[in-house]
Amino acid sequence: MTNIRKTHPLAKIINNSFIDLPTPSNISAWWNFGSLLGVCLILQILTGLFLAMHYTSDTTTAFSSITHICRDVHYGWVIRYMHANGASMFFICLFMHVGRGLYYGSYLFSETWNIGIILLLTVMATAFMGYVLPWGQMSFWGATVITNLLSAIPYIGTDLVEWIWGGFSVDKATLTRFFAFHFILPFIILALAAVHLLFLHETGSNNPSGIPSDSDKIPFHPYYTIKDILGALLLTLALAALVLFSPDLLGDPDNYTPANPLSTPPHIKPEWYFLFAYAILRFIPNKLGGVLALIFSILILAIISLLHTSKQRGMMFRPLSQCLFWLLVADLLTLTWIGGQPVEHPFIIIGQLASILYFTIPLVLMPIAGIIENNLLKW
């Protein structure tokens, strides 16, 4: 009798995706982050669901409802901090996952890669709206500043901003709609993740060498299920350590002050995972130029595959490209640091140089390095 997992319509899909899936035998720990993102997403949906049971999306009670969750709800503080720090873990895994894709040439699976970019943008939108919900000072002013960027769009900008706000300033209507979107978007992310996997399984996974591995595949279960469980355990350990020992490490103290439209915080800044893009936005003097640079700092990923000049797929055997890749990583860390600093000397010039470098490396230097490496192979 044929095994039910191979015949049952629903079990067959799960079997082909997570059990009998032919997987390259040499994929490293860098391939763990996809499953870790799945773990993070499920965790965020579950903790978010329990938070939504106690949260009120009204400007007068939003802040006190968060206080109520932390003080009165049974283990509410754990749920709240797991959700807040879970977002940080989510973005750490996202950056690692995208970095892996860039390093090993996974962007050449264009459908999977493009769905991934849409996923990244959706997750960023969700995280931004979630940051507004506690209705602290940084929530309010962050929402005001970031939504106001749309006013840089010629002709329709101001109308667009007021349409998003639901009035003439960030107020009750804004908070209510942000809560509604923040609740629905994770389920859209879940659906997009399924499409992302669907396209990935059309081609099969890439591997560190970048060489087709059809001749050397092993079943996903038990080899990679065990590996993924280990990754999930380490992630859970890191998250638990963060939540239980220093839950406010990655947060902003200003968000413990209730939102006050009459008092602007000295330094308005978003969560740490947006600081690199925020730094690029800030260090372009022109408003529209800054907004375009901000958008392009993410959308640059969409044209990476067009700039691939090397005859080899990954960077495993390309020392020049490796140097440039790690320079880009260092540059991103520099931008993240600068984004959290005040706009004054010497941070301005460092930010401008780091922003220029951020675009120069993938658009100019990496394609040139690819051509040089191709010619070096002829020697």
From Swiss-Prot:
GO biological process terms, semicolon-separated: mitochondrial electron transport, ubiquinol to cytochrome c
Cofactor(s) needed: heme b
Function: Component of the ubiquinol-cytochrome c reductase complex (complex III or cytochrome b-c1 complex) that is part of the mitochondrial respiratory chain. The b-c1 complex mediates electron transfer from ubiquinol to cytochrome c. Contributes to the generation of a proton gradient across the mitochondrial membrane that is then used for ATP synthesis.
Compartment(s) of residence: Mitochondrion inner membrane
Record-listed heme b b566 binding positions: 97, 196
Name of the protein this chain belongs to: Cytochrome b
Main location: mitochondrion
Organism name: Ursus spelaeus (Cave bear)
Any Pfam family hit: Cytochrome_B
